[in-house]
Amino acid sequence: DEGWRAESQWLWLEKSGLDEDDLDDDDNLEVVLGCTEDDDCDDEGWYYFQSSGKVYTGANKKKINGRYYMFNNHGQMLYEWINGTAKTVSSNAQLDGVASAGSASVEDMRYYNAVEEGWRADGWYEMDGSEDVGTDGDTDWYYVDDGEIKYADGGYKDEATYDEDGKMVYVQRIKINGKYFAFNEKGQMQDGLQYINADSGFYYFDENGYQKTGRVTS
């Protein structure tokens, strides 16, 4: 309201449809938000104004006050599941759901925190899966390392097992903070008795995901 220039701060703004009436109210709308009604940006979102007073734009991650955030070409902060492959080829808000359901691999995806926070995720998250990966109907534990999901690398078919329907399933033991956990190729943590073909043996993981040793009773 005072007309001061926004510098080194976040602002929550509505997307402009570049309507002439809007531009009469604020001559900077077109410059700041750059989205048309046909673009897939959220109707509202966070934008970061740099020390120069100019909004940051660019389909990339940016370090702000010691934390990384992801943006699209219009400067809108992205959050939660982000399709990293699609983000680089479009100016629209590439959140989850831009690809055909199940067409992406978890390797393509990045996870940043909810819109209220938005910075790059690290650690354990119990959450719904990615729509692009086809796991959005399930709530599971995932481990995120600098925005990337830990998952079983299915690059070698001889390291796969098969489920009761004959579908190939990859399960891999991954060491996190000195303890082993099991993940499938979609990044979902696994529990119970798991056969790890790469290790030629069975392992048991409790309900919290920890690999057990010694005698196990149910």
Segment roles from a protein language model:
Residues 1-218:
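Extracellular adhesion/carbohydrate-binding repeat motifs centered on closely spaced tryptophans
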